[in-house]
Design a protein with these regions (language model features):
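Basic, Lys/Arg-enriched alpha-helical interface segments
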Residues: 1-63, 71-78, 82-87
Length: 87
């Protein structure tokens, strides 16, 4: 998928340095995989939550969530933010 606003991931890596590698790993999976449905996402990210085009992914080994908007037809994921929280 094409990851849009990846600069938000870089900002999160600066704000949360202990999660740097896990955020990078999440980005690598998203940018190198074609997901065609929420079910495809769940096969890889079992703990994610989603509704319509809005999806939240917990970042492993942290208390962070990547909040995204995904258009499966266009194969685009927009990074809304990476924030502390739970889903």
């Amino acid at each position: 998928m094409k990851v849009v606003a990846a600069s938000r991931l870089i900002e999160a890596q600066i704000r949360y340095p202990s999660a740097h590698e896990h955020i990078q790993g999440w980005y690598q999976i998203m940018s190198n995989t074609d997901f065609h449905s929420p079910e495809d996402l769940r096969k890889v990210f079992g703990d994610m939550r989603g509704f319509n085009s809005s999806f939240k992914f917990p970042i492993p080994e942290s208390k962070l969530l990547a909040r995204t908007l995904i258009n499966f037809a266009a194969q685009v994921v927009l990074i809304d933010d990476v924030v502390p929280g739970n889903h």
